Amino acid sequence: MAEEAQVIACHTVQEWNEKFQKAKDSGKLIVIDFTASWCGPCRVITPYVSELAKKFPHVAFFKVDVDDLKDVAEEYKVEAMPSFVILKEGQEVERIVGARKDELLHKIAVHAPITA
C-alpha cells in the first residue's frame, strides 16, 4: 500500500536541507507553507494544507515555522504568514500570501494537475 501523503514539517536547518534536497531530486512540485505558532490564519489553513497533500500525493508539501527556521524564511524573503512558495524544478513559480485556499488549490493544480 502506498504511503499516505503528508506535510513534511522541518524543525532544524539540517532536517530542512536533507528533506528539501530529496524532494528537489525527485522532480516533484514543492509547496512550502511558511507558518508560525502564534499566527491565527496559519492555524486555520493547516488542516486544508493537509487535505491538499492527500489530494496531490505527487507534490511535496513542507511546513516551515519561521521562528524555528529563520534562515530559510529569510532565504525566501517571507514577510507575512502564512506564505506559500511553490517551486518547480527548484525555481519559484508562484507565491501566495495569506490563507487563500482557492488560490492555493488553483496554483497547485496548474503546476501539478491530477491525472486520472
UniProtKB/Swiss-Prot annotation:
Its main location: cytoplasm. It is found in: Cytoplasm. SUPFAM superfamilies: Thioredoxin-like (SSF52833). It comes from the Eukaryota. Disulfide bonds join 39-42. Belongs to the thioredoxin family. Plant H-type subfamily. PANTHER family: THIOREDOXIN (PTHR10438), THIOREDOXIN H4-RELATED (PTHR10438:SF453). This is Thioredoxin H-type. It comes from Fagopyrum esculentum (Common buckwheat). The lineage of its organism: Eukaryota, Viridiplantae, Streptophyta, Embryophyta, Tracheophyta.
